[in-house]
Amino acid sequence: FSTMQMMSKADVLDKFRPDEFDFICIDETHRAGAESYQRILEYFKPQFLLGMTASPERTDNFDIFDLYDYNIAYEIRLQQALEENLLCPFHYFGITDLEIDGETFDDESGLRNFVKLVSDERVDYILKQVEYFGYSGDRVKGLVFCSRKDEGEELARKFCQRGYRARMLSGDDSQAVREEVIDRLVSDTREDYLDYVFTVDIFNEGVDIPEVNQVVMLRPTQSPIVFVQQLGRGLRKSDDKEFVVILDFIGNYKNNFMIPIALSGDRSYNKDTMRRYVSEGARVIPGSSTIHFDEISKKRIYQAIDSASTNDLRTLKEAYSNLKQKLGRIPKLKDFYDYGTIDVTKFFDKLGSYHEFLKKYEADYTTELSEKEEAILQFISRKLAK
């Protein structure tokens, strides 16, 4: 066993022959595009190379599937993992974030208004909710995700003023400090234990804290990937908890439509499917997990769904690139359905046909159609999209 940081050092690599190991397992392999990972992967020549990741969909266009000859040995998503009882059940509550002076937190002003983000009124409101919805176990062991470092620092300070033990962790803290703070959070014997750890994004991935029994989200949803990563910090099973409580404080953000996408695992970006999940998610979530949105949160999510552009080129290109990397070839229309990714009619709506998308954005696509054939294809595609 070795950490990536240790093994990527030249003097450490030199201690091993390229064929030293028959089997190598790379954890967090979605990071394999980084120079340090590449140094390791290019040096060793094992007989069998296995990669593991909880984030196979990338936004940086690096093809991790190519490293493994597009051979996916096993894949399991959140919904299936819950069905098979591999994860701790969760109770998700979408809670309306506080209005201050008649104003809601939104994309235009909310995240920039530091005074309102950390106001006593908001802190008291947050604490009222975390105390009301509670946790499983003898004491709370919570992670709080914020939008900004200074917000997390000030909120942690104000939690402490109100009798809670809290600490902010950021990317500026060393690995030793992070490990010490996590130990204080999970320990039941230390006198300097912590109730809450605030952070921005250093716990999105690669951190295993099974004891966490409450996750508080005080930031807008950046993407379905990040949402599931942060939700997942509480989904590891532990003898000390029966379930984890997820509290999502929902402002008036344009990305709110991503919440049902993340929770459902449905990547079709179909607006009717999103709306249905907001109203019926509690019925269809597997096992003993539950999902609940208060009425104002529902309204905000519906508004975000209505105004969302779900067939913009960035979304289409990202969905296409992820599927192409997984398959190792240009996807067929049926592949999008088989692999549960974006609704193909989004391509029809945006560009008239999938052929037109490939012609413009896929360098390896060589199929040519006559003007008449293209017109017929676009006519049929647009009819299907309606």
Task: Specify the residue positions occupied by each region the protein language model found.
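Conserved helix/coil segment N-terminal to the catalytic DExD/H
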Residues: 2-23, 34-39
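Conserved RecA-like ASCE P-loop NTPase motor core of nucleic-acid helicases/translocases
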Residues: 140-148, 169
